[in-house]
């Protein structure tokens, strides 16, 4: 039996990094936090027990080769960074870009997870795991979402 698909719309800043990461790496905007990456990969690994996980990059990193290359480099260690797509480069609010992506690809809103530190305030908000930009994605965020999804 095929697993149900789960499309994860991934933001990077405020999810896979945090304010401490930026303070320690002032030379570049494209930084990742080991702690946040480990929490994210744990979410991916656990989610894959129930779902066929597809990661869509919704971060502004999608618009810059430097950002895409950084994620690609880390994808060798963290398979949760293997991307199957990205939202179109647009000027709309993130939730509008994600909604349009879903509509254009016939993706049911119940089959998505948006991991983002920005507020999602439309019909997608019930599928939003909101992080805190100061801390990024924490294990407590991951555990709460896994429990909500019935994943052990």
Q: What are the functions of these language-model segments?
A:
Residues 1-152:
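Catalytic phosphate/metal-binding cores of nucleic-acid and nucleotide-processing enzymes, i.e., regions
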